[in-house]
Amino acid sequence: MSKKSKNSSIEFDAIVVGGGHAGIEAVYALLKKKLKVVLITLDKKKLASMPCNPAIGGPAKGIITREIDALGGVQGKFSDLAMIQIKYLNESKGPAVLAIRAQIDKEKYSKLILKDLKKQENLLIIEDLVSELLVEKNRVFGLKTAKKQVFFSKTVIITTGTYMDSKVLRGSLAIPSGPDGQQTSNLLSNNLKRLGFELQRLKTGTPPRIFTSSIDFSKVEKEVLPVYNINFSFQSKHKLKKQISCYLTYTTAKTHDIINKNLGKSSMYSGLISGVGPRYCPSIEDKIVRFSEKPRHQIFFEPETKKQDIMYINGLSTSMPEDVQLEMVKTIPGLENAKIAKFGYAIEYDALNPLELKKSLETKKVKGLFMAGQINGTSGYEEAAAQGLVAGINAGQFVLGKKPVEILRNDGYIGVLIDDLVTKGTKEPYRMLTSRAEYRLILRNDNADIRMAKYALKSGLISKKEYLKIKAKYAKIDRKILELSKEFVSPKDELAKKYNLEKRISKLKLISWPNVNFKDILPDFEFGYELTVMARLKGYIQKQNSEAQKMIRLEKLLIPGDLNYEKVANLSSEALDKFQKVRPKTIGEASRISGVNPADIQMLLFHIKVLKMQKVSKI
């Protein structure tokens, strides 16, 4: 779309505020629905930037990226095009927690997205800051910017990441700034507060970057990987031909001494930071204090681009002053002569209390206003992208007058993520872990396509033809399973000799053995891995599916939207407070709210039953 001089004369379907991983997914979801979109970002050359580690995926997170792809999102597709290394994690722990992680050329990733967005119709990209949301009668209808521009729209999605009233902290310095020296503003924060939203201060951090030419690689361990024939995207045909290595080293006793002697200079320990940091990604200062018994901690060198001129020092996140960072870095094997390209820092920012949100990621206070990404209290590119995609889908549904799309916990990690946020809230940056999912045997890396298919079709992000292709894949697997149950291996067969079989056995039984290579039985079947996983986990999957059905029944028990919780007898005071704040839509949601016990749920069910009986008696 060509840029207009008077944007206030145009009404858009949606405005997306912020061009990070959440914002980009939201934009693509809206464009797929043929809607007219404005993307407001600080710097279009830094779309979906990676201010922290240059990687996508990891335990649970890699499965989220697969789900994003299956749901019609783009993170997996662009990761495949920009990856410089890819590998499986947790292979030895079984298929339930198997995940993909890729090192990404962060510069290429942003360039690919900008290049692709420039081709899109119905999109206007503006470099500006948002100063005020336009709200009337609790409904958003547009916004104003710092450059005095006004945009009108039917819906707004805020995906500001860590940029709202953010401060970069290093030692005693606290500089108003976003990540990577970008602009920040308190205008939107103040506007949200005036609208009655509850904000909280959160904190994250990043390590120093080192010029690769200054590293002594003879003192570190090189990660040597085979070339894996794997991708994030189910549609991708791009395969990595060469793996670029990462490197492993460790902190030393000298490193720990320097940190301990200078703890008071760290922004974290000087009292300069009030925000709560991520539990599962602590700073090096935190690690030394909390795990003082450990003689050393792992440090990984990760290339930021294919050029490999800068290394991200994973494991050394810090808010120490620059002189202390330099002293500390030089005590690490391989970094004795290191030259720092960019010093580490902590960043503190405003985030929304996610209890303010519906499962659609629309706010409860303002209709048509959606929130996604780190503003909702999460950490990580994958968690952000997942929320952006869901917010984009549902903002589109809102504009088109359709029902929101809400992913259940038993169908995806995306469902677990959003359900946790809107029912439990978070007081620290939330990171997805496999342990957060009750049904992780069902929520696997290999079956994300079929789990997301119905949601993608309902969202309009995949066609009926694409949906039927996914269904046909699993029908083919089911037919092959039936065939294998009727085909047998006798003790005289070559296959029997290889696996020391003493009696006749079905091929299905044989393939379910953990020591059997499925390619020996299915050399030419394209979905052999998926079939093998289903065969080996059959009993466990059936059990978890049964448990999931019980949860689904609770999700179907609706709570009246206008229910007066103060009239529910014998509720605990904590349950009353949480119910009034969260206002769960179903008994299933209510049961997962922290502080709510089974007795509270029983009283709630009884009260709803009485209300229904009273209504019937009046008829």
From Swiss-Prot:
Highest taxon of the lineage? Bacteria
Family matches, as InterPro entries: FAD/NAD-bd_sf (IPR036188), MnmG (IPR004416), MnmG-rel (IPR002218), MnmG-rel_CS (IPR020595), MnmG_C (IPR026904), MnmG_C_subdom (IPR047001), MnmG_C_subdom_sf (IPR044920), MnmG_N (IPR040131)
Any keyword ATP-binding?
Answer: no
Question: Where does the sequence pass through the membrane?
Answer: none
The record lists FAD as bound by: 18-23, 130, 185, 374
Q: Which GO terms describe its cellular component?
A: cytosol
What Gene Ontology molecular-function terms does this entry list?
Answer: flavin adenine dinucleotide binding
Where's it mainly located?
Answer: cytoplasm
Subunit-level organization: Homodimer. Heterotetramer of two MnmE and two MnmG subunits.
Q: What is this protein called?
A: tRNA uridine 5-carboxymethylaminomethyl modification enzyme MnmG
Organism, scientific name: Mesomycoplasma hyopneumoniae (strain 7448)
Where is the organism placed in the taxonomic lineage, from the top?
Bacteria, Bacillati, Mycoplasmatota, Mycoplasmoidales, Metamycoplasmataceae
The record's gene field reads mnmG
